[in-house]
Amino acid sequence: MIKPLIEFCVGNLASGSQAALEKLEKDPNLDVMEYGCLGYCGICFEGPFALVNGEVVQGSTVEELVNNVYEYLDENPMF
């Protein structure tokens, strides 16, 4: 079974999205990855974000980011 891919930039983790990564890693239905740089420096500077199946998902807080990731997945099923 292919799982949704959630990607985080290490620079954004240092800026506060580490808690979102840790929460999402607990979900066995997600593949959560961490990379050195995803090339979204402007977005990274603005606040917490992740790539969800290749699409940028943002939040003004860690909690909002996690909620927005799940909302994106609900609205954009893989199959």
Curated annotation (Swiss-Prot):
Protein family per UniProt: Belongs to the UPF0349 family.
NCBIfam families: PRK13669.1
Protein name per its UniProtKB record: UPF0349 protein BCAH820_5046
Organism of this sequence: Bacillus cereus (strain AH820)
